[in-house]
Amino acid sequence: MGSMSIWHWLVVGVLVLLLFGKGRFSDMMGDVAKGIKSFKKGMSEEDEPTQPAEPRPTPRLQQQPPIEPNADPKLQPMQDDRPQH
């Protein structure tokens, strides 16, 4: 008995027909065909040259208000505590 003889394929075919049914299997194949057509259409649309969009001017940033010194006397600038080499 060889592997994948004609009888094996017939049994597999009957099981597929029983599980999916005649109409359901053809519907699935139709959906696959629609997907392939849609994919091909999308690929052909990408090949068409597109005109680059006009560059928009960059928005100017508004000047920020100057930093006011902090009036809190407890605050001091950070000290560098790294060891000197």
From Swiss-Prot:
Domain of life: Bacteria
Any Pfam family hit: TatA_B_E
Region (Disordered): 39-85
Membrane topology label: Single-pass membrane protein
Subcellular location, record wording: Cell inner membrane
GO annotation, biological process: protein transport by the Tat complex
Subunit: The Tat system comprises two distinct complexes: a TatABC complex, containing multiple copies of TatA, TatB and TatC subunits, and a separate TatA complex, containing only TatA subunits. Substrates initially bind to the TatABC complex, which probably triggers association of the separate TatA complex to form the active translocon.
GO MF entry, a single one: protein transmembrane transporter activity
GO cellular component: TAT protein transport complex
Transmembrane feature ranges: 1-21
Covalent S-S links between cysteines: none
UniProt protein name: Sec-independent protein translocase protein TatA
Primary subcellular site in the record, as a coarse category: membrane
HAMAP family (UniProt xref): TatA_E
Family membership: Belongs to the TatA/E family.
InterPro entries, per the entry: TatA/B/E, TatA/E
Keyword list, A-Z: Cell inner membrane, Cell membrane, Membrane, Protein transport, Translocation, Transmembrane, Transmembrane helix, Transport
Keyword Transmembrane appears in the UniProt entry: yes
Function: Part of the twin-arginine translocation (Tat) system that transports large folded proteins containing a characteristic twin-arginine motif in their signal peptide across membranes. TatA could form the protein-conducting channel of the Tat system.
